Structures are given as C-alpha cells and as structure tokens.
C-alpha cells in the first residue's frame, strides 16, 4: 500500500506529522486510495493562528508532504487549530466548515474535497 513520503531532508512540523499519520492510515483503504490515485496537484494546509503550514504534492497516486506553503498551490485551506483538529478527526465536515466560515478555502475546490477523503479520520 502507498505511504505518504516526506520531502527529502525535512523533518515535518506538528501539523505535517498529524496529517501524515492520518493519511497513511487512510491510504491503506483501497477505496480511499482510488479517489486520489489520478489526482495531480498541490494543496497547502495552513493553521491560521500560528501560520504553520504544510504542502501536499499529489501525482500518480503518490503523496509527498513538505513543511511550509508553496507560492502557487492548486488548492489551499486555512483554519484555526481547533477547527483543523475537528475537521481532521471527522467531527466537522470540511463543507460545513467552509459554509460557516470556519475554514477558508480557495483554488480547485474539487481537489480539496477529493483530498479530504485521506486527510480526515473516518
């Protein structure tokens, strides 16, 4: 089964470490893997209070994480720590979070929704 790779020479920040654990577990599910298998692009996830960010690079079914945000991601999302925790634990739907203003998102929203299949514990 695929595993999330970490950009060479980097040690992930706390946000990246949390997401890697969740994504590694989710990618073991063939149905969830199939949803991202053909995706190509990058996604920035940022914690708004501290500015801590990670970038996911997805291509050909492989996922790589790196610290910090890149300049031009395909999609991005930003929320406070508590809301990111609620979203990643499955207690708050990413769609509801966007509609209620708890999550800022931009770029390719379809990609965000597809990637949420592996970034949320379910």
Range-by-range predicted roles:
Residues 1-122:
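Feature captures hydrophobic
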């Amino acid at each position: 089964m695929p595993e999330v790779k970490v950009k060479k020479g980097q040690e992930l920040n706390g946000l990246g470490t949390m997401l890697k654990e969740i994504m590694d577990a989710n990618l073991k599910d063939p149905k969830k893997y199939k949803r991202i298998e053909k995706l190509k692009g990058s996604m920035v996830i940022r914690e708004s209070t501290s500015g801590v960010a990670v970038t996911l690079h997805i291509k050909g079914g492989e996922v790589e994480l790196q610290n910090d945000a890149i300049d031009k991601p395909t999609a991005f999302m930003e929320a406070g720590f508590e809301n990111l925790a609620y979203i990643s634990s499955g207690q708050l739907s990413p769609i509801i979070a966007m509609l209620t203003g708890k999550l800022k998102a931009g770029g390719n929203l379809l990609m965000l929704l597809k990637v949420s299949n592996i970034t949320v514990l379910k």
